[in-house]
Amino acid sequence: AASDVYKRQEYWCIPSREDAEFIACMEDVLDVYELPYNPQRPVVCMDEKPYQLLGEARSPLPMRPGNDQKVDSEYVRNGTCSIFAFVEPLGGAHHVSVREHRTAIDWAEEIKYLADVMYPDVEKIILVMDNLNTHKPASLYKRYTADEARRIMKRLEIHYTPKHESWLDIAEIELNVMTRQCLNRRIDNISNLRKELSAWEVERNTVAAKVNWQFRTEDARIKLNSLYPTFTTASE
């Protein structure tokens, strides 16, 4: 029977049991999101996603009066690339870029761009991101001299989301919005993808699209109460 072959699987967006490490990282990030807007200490969220470049196996039939464009279900895989995204939730600043790979070197170069181009004059950049293996200070030292890597690091205050819990990274929301608005069709090469995302970035920055994050520590302590360690107080 099919039920004997296909076993039901469960996937959790949050831990299924008490998890102090998750709680500690989550509350740290939520505290950052509650900080008031300070242009000298901007809170910036960063995330990245792979993207599959797809070409057409056959030329689409163009739109005609009364008929939509017709696209063949068959497509051609043209390799993959990586999309990096930065968003400042309270300031409304946005940046997306496309790279052929997602190595430590790529991340380091993106962080240098964040520090030297996006925010060259601020006191400190408060950076929220997931703890992917390349999202580490060591990556800067792999790309730049020790002096340069240290200079960039001193510009940053890093906060990591809990492991496997990237829903706490506002930049993931940004990538989801971008996917719905800009990537709902086949794009066959990096050059075209960069043009599409550049236009999308300009639009997002023109309207200074902000993010109103509502989930706070006090909410977490109620809704996720089962994940918090419990303590028994001895009676006197």
What are these regions (language model features)?
Residues 1-6:
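Short, small-residue-biased leader/transition segments that mark boundaries at the very start
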Residues 26-112, 224:
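Extended, low-complexity cationic-aromatic segments
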Residues 45-47, 86, 111, 130, ...:
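Mobile genetic element proteins and their domesticated derivatives, centered on retroelements
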Residues 57, 192-236:
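C-terminal domain-tail junction helix/linker
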Residues 69-75, 148-170, 186-189:
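RNase H-like polynucleotidyl transferase catalytic core
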Residues 94, 163, 171-190, 203-207:
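Active-site proximal helix-loop segment of RNase H-like, two-metal nucleases, encompassing DDE(D)
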Residues 105-126:
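Short, basic/hydrophobic alpha-helical segments
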Residues 122-136, 162:
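Acidic/histidine-rich, metal-coordinating catalytic segments
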